Regions:
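An acidic-aromatic
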Residues: 52-113, 199
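Extended beta-strand-rich segments in extracellular/periplasmic secretory proteins, especially
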Residues: 113-183
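Non-transmembrane domains of secretory- and envelope-associated proteins
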Residues: 167-174, 183-254, 260-262, 269
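Conserved redox-active cysteine motifs that mediate thiol-disulfide chemistry
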Residues: 270, 278-295
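Structural microenvironment flanking redox-active thiols in thiol-disulfide oxidoreductases
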Residues: 287-327, 336-343
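Thiol/disulfide oxidoreductase modules built on the thioredoxin-like
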Residues: 325-329, 335-381
């Protein structure tokens, strides 16, 4: 009981320190990991200007994320009313006011100190099923929060129990870890672990309370020569062809690398039917589809049917190799190129399933995955063509 009280008192002290932060500037390294991997899937270095924003009842903070190597280059901005997303390749800046496809929360990754503050506040006040641990590691304290609920818990400002998707996500346990520096009793590193995805953020060069929210104006960071567009227009204007417009057309040919970095061509495959699955490491629906796809591969002979996955998110051969090994894939997985994503018109979204007949005509296109429904749809389409 004494140890628990001491833990609680220390966390309250850290929370008080976090609540005193009106503004913070810092460099942050954000890593994305797959459970079981020994190397990060992606690593991003950013410079952050974070402001406490009591006027914003959703996230409770405003911030701008800039490229760590070029702090004039905007990566993301949120001011409590809008988020700004730059598309550097075509010099567009999308402004989202959250009225398009509204959700119960704002889909904004909270900045470091806002996130840490809400994690600790939740740990001290929640009635959810949680287990906490505080450990002295010399120069820092290590804090671990394990949330054992029927839904995963994410923080967009306060904690939200995430709606369960129409597929099995595995464990719904959520784990949050903080490393707290003893010199200032503030976190400098955090880790979030879900069944499908792990993210780690590490801060450096912290400066606190040099500015206030009144110094912050989002438009100061907008690139001057970019066209400003509404976020909703990026979706509404889709007069461009979509993947389903390929039905009845010849499947675009490709030569892509496998996990041994060897070239593989669509023309190499001689089976009657081919299922091409555009997938993404870190995509929950894609991972949920794997048991069915493995079973599907074993249900037909190689003369009848072939299954090829094309990894369109990570583009790192080592990550794809680890993924194939960890998931014990019994089918080929290839590394996508921008060209093949463009040809198949997926826009980088996943999962997509293209069912291709013996003449290599695309006969069916399915987007997304929902356990039994998608399984039946794919099996029926294959059997019809056989």
């Amino acid at each position: 009981a004494n140890a628990q009280n001491a833990e609680k008192e220390y966390l309250k002290k850290v929370l008080t320190n976090l609540e005193k932060i009106e503004s913070a500037t810092y460099y942050v390294t954000n890593e994305s990991w797959q459970p079981g991997d020994s190397t990060a899937l992606s690593t991003l270095h950013s410079f952050i200007k974070e402001y406490d924003n009591p006027m914003d009842s959703t996230i409770g903070a405003s911030y701008v994320s800039l490229d760590a190597n070029d702090t004039t280059k905007l990566e993301f901005c949120y001011d409590g009313n809008i988020r700004a997303l730059p598309y550097h390749e075509n010099k567009k800046l999308a402004i989202d006011d959250f009225t398009f496809r509204p959700l119960p929360f704002r889909l904004v990754s909270p900045p470091f100190f806002n996130h840490a503050k809400n994690i600790i506040r939740y740990a001290l006040t929640t009635k959810d099923h949680i287990v906490t641990e505080l450990k002295d590691e010399g120069d820092n304290y290590y804090f671990k929060l394990v949330i054992d609920e029927n839904q995963q818990v994410e923080f967009f400002g306060k904690a939200y129990h995430m709606p369960l998707p129409p597929f099995d996500i595995g464990s719904t346990t959520s784990i949050y870890e903080l490393w707290i520096n003893k010199s200032n009793d503030l976190p400098y590193k955090k880790r979030r672990e879900m069944s499908h995805d792990i993210s780690v953020s590490t801060c450096s060069n912290l400066a606190i309370n040099r500015h206030t929210i009144y110094d912050f104006n989002a438009s100061d960071y907008f690139p001057k020569d970019y066209e400003i567009v509404k976020y909703s227009d990026l979706y509404k204007k889709k007069a461009e062809p979509t993947a389903s417009s390929l039905i009845g057309k010849k499947a675009p040919g490709w030569i892509l690398e496998n996990i041994e970095a060897q070239p593989v061509s669509l023309a190499d495959y001689k089976s009657k039917i081919i299922l091409i699955n555009f997938t993404g490491i870190g995509c929950g629906a894609c991972q949920a589809a794997i048991p069915f796809l493995k079973q599907l591969k074993d249900s037909f002979t190689s003369e009848e049917f072939e299954l090829i996955a094309i990894e369109s998110w990570s583009r790192k051969v080592s990550a794809i190799r680890n993924y194939a090994k960890r998931k014990e894939l019994n089918y080929t997985i290839l590394n996508a190129t921008n060209e093949v994503i463009k040809q198949y018109q997926t826009g980088g979204a996943a999962p997509y399933f293209f069912i291709v007949d013996q003449e290599r005509i695309i006969r069916k296109v399915i987007r997304g995955y929902s356990n039994e429904n998608t399984d039946k749809e794919i099996i029926n389409a294959i059997k019809e063509l056989l």
